[in-house]
């Protein structure tokens, strides 16, 4: 069957829902798709709650990551929306999902107000570089007391300000459940939320002018056509028939040619920064490429094993370690799409690092990773996120 071409007429924005597990992230995601489908039926298909909630499991290193991708459009923009429904691993995996957001909708239940997870998500959003957060004050139909709503709103604004997000961001009172049920007042609340998303999340500054780079998330074999790697283009543009290099993890890099680009199961002539695409690679076997590598313009990215990083170590309350760590600590460093074990050297004069500390560390990785200064990473122990940081200096 011939594939339809993907029309690139509107700005494309990656967003997601973050927040405490029972506050209604998934219900809100379903409500947004339904309300936009009803408002712009030509532009959107509706997605049922259970289609989103039964997110495909992505198993990585023995951890189950549930992430659901939906797409929808407003008059102004085309959105790709990620939601990781209520799984206990949500927080640990936020680093993988949140890295793909140009903005986030923080879902806070008006009935509860901000919870510890709410705080942790906002903190992680800051660490992984989500540029903008606005707020959906969900379950607002269940709170009659105007003063209580204002109090919760104030708390949420303080929370945003504490992590240097815009404390004047829109806070929209919604009821995702009532909107799904078709209650006119609350349908309108979701329309208002999406207007706020359109207006407040800045147009992403796409990195289309930089050299092409795409982290590999998954690898497939398509019978008769070859090997496809999927991921979100981090920067630059890739055209069909361009040469690329596969860098990182393995001792040596591999060159190949891109023979096809697909997005949302539609063919493109090119993929550009911010697009989730599949690239068909010429002459590459399934086992020649793996998650954690990057596909890049030849000669523009180099793999490294030693670097200095500026890190924040989660406190016990944020779900982090309960005890300090010392020199030669050996956690996993999660870069883009995969974990690599590394050995930590503490700065001169520092005996140990406590949960809740900010510090600089030197790291020696056991496998090379394609990196530049400014690249962010998570620090994990057996799949549990215990810290986050960014590369400040490459040593080797």
Swiss-Prot record:
Residues 62-66 are annotated as: G2. Residues 138-141 are annotated as: G4. Mg(2+) binds at residue 26. One of its GO terms (molecular function) is translation elongation factor activity. Its EC number is 3.6.5.3. HAMAP family: EF_Tu_B. Monomer. This is Elongation factor Tu. It comes from Mycolicibacterium paratuberculosis (strain ATCC BAA-968 / K-10). The lineage of its organism: Bacteria, Bacillati, Actinomycetota, Actinomycetes, Mycobacteriales.
